[in-house]
Design a protein with these regions (language model features):
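C-terminal active-site "lid" helix and adjoining low-complexity regulatory extension at the edge
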Residues: 177-184, 188, 192-200, 207-243
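Active-site nucleotide/adenylate-binding loops and adjacent lid/helix of ATP-dependent enzymes
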Residues: 1-134, 139-142, 148-154, 161-188
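Conserved protein-kinase catalytic-loop segment immediately C-terminal to the catalytic Asp
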Residues: 139, 206-207
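Short beta-strand
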Residues: 65, 204-205
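Short, solvent-exposed aromatic-acidic interface loops
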Residues: 150-156, 219-222
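Short secondary-structure junction motifs
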Residues: 109, 200-202
């Protein structure tokens, strides 16, 4: 059965439909679990060279690093944010370790992704330096949006490394309201993706200096969904609240 949650599955199908970060995909048969025991797999040097080449195609560091299934962005500076290529091996180690620990059977890590860092205007920082900016998650089923939400629920930051101190709640509230024009744009782009792929998907959108970019997707039934309330909602023109 095809692994449709793997970025390598869905990205080639949607990259020409909506704005997405420049992306390089590296597949490997390297037995990476061996690095957790302090050993270098036979294919290690070749894999690292392939990753370096991918980074070079994007103009070098800094880049966004992830597997086909996770970035573990809550450990930002130790995992997905690669500031210097000399730290590539350690970041790969950290992502492999995290992937092995997720749930009971872990996550696959044969697919590796290098992406450009999109220009954003953060309102505060959390999770070891991760820039927090406006993001929304849309759910699309059979080509129609049936739910949308701010990406970040407030409880995500209660135990974070935020340097915003007491201001973070106010700042989060400000970026958690979506204007009508943006909702119309994101709905249209999400439904374009949904019609192209079919099925039920969650689609994540990030506001950048270039506009809205689609950054991630996953099977809708397996994606985190929450109901935004109060100041997170803005009335649509016809008086219907955002779901």
């Amino acid at each position: 059965m095809e692994d449709i949650t793997n970025l390598a599955y869905w990205y080639p199908k949607v990259k020409h439909l909506v704005p997405t970060p420049k992306t390089e995909i590296v597949e490997t048969d390297c037995n990476l679990i061996e690095i957790l025991d302090g050993e270098a797999p036979n294919e290690w040097r070749g894999f690292i060279e392939d990753m370096r080449v991918a980074i070079g195609r994007l103009g070098g560091c800094p880049v966004f690093l992830r597997t086909g299934h996770t970035s573990n962005k809550h450990e930002w500076s130790d995992t997905c944010y690669l500031a210097d290529v000399k730290d590539l091996g350690q970041h790969i180690y950290n992502l492999v370790e995290f992937s092995e620990c997720v749930d009971m059977i872990g996550l696959p890590y044969k697919t590796w992704i290098v992406r450009e860092l999109l220009p954003v205007k953060p309102v505060f920082y959390a999770f070891k330096g991760m820039p927090i900016t406006q993001e929304f998650r849309y759910f699309v089923k059979d080509g129609e949006v049936d739910h949308r939400q701010p990406y970040w629920p407030p409880e995500a930051f209660l135990k974070s490394y935020s340097n915003a101190e007491k201001e973070w709640e106010k700042l989060l509230a400000e970026i958690s309201v979506l204007d009508k024009v943006s909702d119309k744009e994101l709905t249209a782009m999400t439904e374009k993706i949904g019609k192209a792929l079919g099925g039920y998907w969650s689609v994540d959108w990030l506001l950048t200096d270039r506009g809205w970019y689609m950054t991630d997707m996953a099977e809708g039934a397996m994606s985190y969904k929450w109901q935004a309330e109060g100041f997170y909602l803005e009335k649509l023109p016809e008086g219907k609240e955002l779901e």
